[in-house]
């Protein structure tokens, strides 16, 4: 069933009236009735006229309706577009706001990070400054301690020097002389020592020698009026000795038995042994004063001054000029036959290039 509205109903009525009028016109033509002017009546014409007017009215209403509908649709479309545009604007604004918030957050984070870095840098600098100050304080303390220790050492050295000076000031070096008289003539050997006083010490008095050797309270250098600085200069040349040729001294292959010499006058075990020193037969007063005894024999020849002193004469030393005894006239190299020389080595006819057995002395260092 089709849907009918005013327009379709009016259109159906128009078609119906028009069909009746056409059928009346056909009947007129077929019957050929002279009294029938029109094929349809006036009522039918009026009905058809009304229907046509109604149809046109419906079309006008339909046009208005369609126009209004178009306007409404356009309005809805515009409203939709405006709403869409508003939504887009809102979304854009919201997006911009979110971006701005993100940017603010990033700026805040960067600011906080920068502040944190600055704070850390500040703390680091403070820590470095504290460490630097601490190190400076420690360095000052160390220097202060070193200065105090140095001052203490200096005061100790000054005190030691003052003690030594006071000790040496108490000694008498002006009257040290040596009595070279033979025991057969005068019967005594007078030795004036600064440590023993200016009085004579008789050699005839029996004084047993100890096992440790002679009395160490009488330094021989001080007896001749020599100080520490003067006596040290006598042996300074030993520091310049070249010992590179004795390369085996540091090893275990150095044979020291070849250097044993018969120093009977200086190292006679029989004469210098403790029993003989304590033996009355060898240490009695007659033995000590016997001019024929080798122990008490004294050579009165002064090699440095080229003088021969007789028995009973006294060799005096000038204490104001200690170097007079140790002048150029003293032959320090004449050591007698008890010392080996280069000629003694050459007389041995040793093949210096031949290598010995393992552990022996390497003779290549002694090539002459």
Curated annotation (Swiss-Prot):
Comp. bias (Low complexity): 265-290
CC annotations in GO: core mediator complex; cytosol; mediator complex
Pfam families: Med2 (PF11214)
Superkingdom classification of source: Eukaryota
Start-end of Basic and acidic residues biased regions: 112-163
UniProt entry keywords in alphabetical sequence: Activator, Nucleus, Transcription, Transcription regulation
GO molecular function: RNA polymerase II-specific DNA-binding transcription factor binding; transcription coactivator activity
Keyword Ubl conjugation: no
GO biological process: negative regulation of transcription by RNA polymerase II; positive regulation of transcription elongation by RNA polymerase II; positive regulation of transcription initiation by RNA polymerase II; response to endoplasmic reticulum stress; RNA polymerase II preinitiation complex assembly
Polar residues: compositionally biased ranges: 177-192
Record family assignment: Belongs to the Mediator complex subunit 2 family.
Assembly description: Component of the Mediator complex.
Record's protein name: Mediator of RNA polymerase II transcription subunit 2
The organism of origin for this protein: Candida glabrata (strain ATCC 2001 / BCRC 20586 / JCM 3761 / NBRC 0622 / NRRL Y-65 / CBS 138)
Lineage: Eukaryota, Fungi, Dikarya, Ascomycota, Saccharomycotina
Gene: MED2
């Amino acid at each position: 069933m089709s849907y009918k509205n005013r327009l379709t109903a009016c259109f159906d009525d128009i078609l119906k009236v028009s069909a009746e009028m056409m059928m009346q016109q056909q009947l007129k033509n077929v019957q050929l009735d002279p009294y029938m002017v029109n094929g349809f009546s006036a009522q039918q014409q009026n009905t058809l006229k009304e229907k046509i007017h109604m149809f046109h009215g419906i079309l006008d209403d339909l046009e208005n309706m369609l126009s209004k509908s178009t306007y409404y649709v356009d309005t809805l479309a515009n409203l939709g577009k405006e709403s869409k545009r508003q939504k887009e604007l809102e979304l854009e604004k919201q997006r911009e706001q979110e971006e701005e918030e993100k940017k603010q957050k990033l700026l805040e984070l960067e600011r906080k990070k920068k502040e944190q870095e600055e704070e850390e840098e500040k703390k680091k600098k403070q820590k470095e400054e504290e460490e630097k100050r601490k190190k400076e304080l420690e360095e000052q303390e160390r220097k202060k301690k070193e200065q105090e220790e140095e001052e203490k050492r200096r005061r100790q050295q000054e005190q030691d020097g003052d003690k030594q000076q006071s000790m040496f000031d108490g000694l008498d070096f002006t009257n040290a002389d040596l009595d070279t008289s033979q025991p057969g003539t005068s019967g005594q050997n007078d030795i004036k020592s600064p440590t023993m006083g200016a009085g004579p010490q008789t050699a005839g008095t029996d004084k047993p020698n100890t096992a440790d050797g002679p009395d160490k309270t009488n330094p021989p250098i001080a007896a001749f009026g020599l100080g520490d600085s003067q006596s040290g200069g006598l042996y300074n040349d030993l520091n310049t000795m070249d010992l590179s040729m004795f390369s085996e001294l540091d090893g275990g292959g150095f044979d020291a038995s070849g250097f044993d010499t018969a120093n009977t006058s200086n190292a006679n075990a029989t004469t210098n042994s403790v029993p003989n020193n304590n033996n009355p037969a060898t240490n009695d007063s007659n033995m000590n004063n016997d001019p024929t005894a080798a122990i008490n024999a004294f050579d009165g020849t002064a090699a440095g001054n080229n003088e021969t002193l007789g028995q009973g004469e006294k060799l005096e030393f000038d204490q104001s000029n200690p170097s007079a005894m140790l002048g150029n006239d003293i032959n320090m190299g004449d050591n007698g036959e008890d010392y080996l020389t280069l000629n003694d080595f050459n007389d041995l006819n040793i093949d210096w290039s031949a290598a010995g057995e393992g552990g022996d002395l390497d003779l290549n260092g002694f090539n002459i």
